[in-house]
Amino acid sequence: MGSSLNDRSVVITRSLSQNESFRRLLEARGAHVVEVPLIAIAEPEDEGRERDEVLQRFDEFDWIVVTSPNGADCVAPFLVASNAAGDAIRFPSLAAVGEATARSLGVTVAMTANPARADVLAEQFPQGTGSVLVVQGNLADDELGETLTAKGWTVTRVVAYRTVQLRPTREMMLPAMAADVLMLASGSAATAWFDSFGTTTPPFVVAMGPSTAKVALALGLEVTDVAPEQTLESMIQTAERVIATL
């Protein structure tokens, strides 16, 4: 049986560097993909100096917690190089929000939140008195760090990357407005959509996870359904379910 997305037009709003895998998955279902990159991933304001300084001494921490594949891409080179050289005094335990983040780290991960949400990781993280490095983007809130602190840990938070907003061209906007489905993979993408399009959306809007849906709803966007897991496959399956009910 074919996908209900076959011959449907689907808008994806992730950064260009992240859109390719999403586009391939949708095209495999027969969807017509409309790419409207509304965000981009950039270096932090200090060009990553603080991040790199902290990661160069990562073996001082008992745990490293990474909340996204973007953060994992910043951490992985330090971990892999040290692991290969065998020069780390000790290797911290690693915790990741979601399987995609865990895979991006490139080394063994002790704890993976599933579904891929920071609040799930915070809940399952143990009580302790050691040190934890939390690696996040500039738009992440402090809830994860605060929860770990309440559990007894000494938390250091470092901004690994910065999410910046892009403005779509008119040539991008027209096919997006005529599409069947809008995929919002983050709260920042929802905000960027609102800033460019207002509350006007395609007929169906799928949000990745409750945090993205919360931002979209607060902006006045009508969210048709919420993917239960913060993965591309979960978003696609949710969109298929929505379309199949027509």
Please report, for each region that a protein language model flagged, where it lies by residue.
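Conserved beta-alpha
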Residues: 1-246
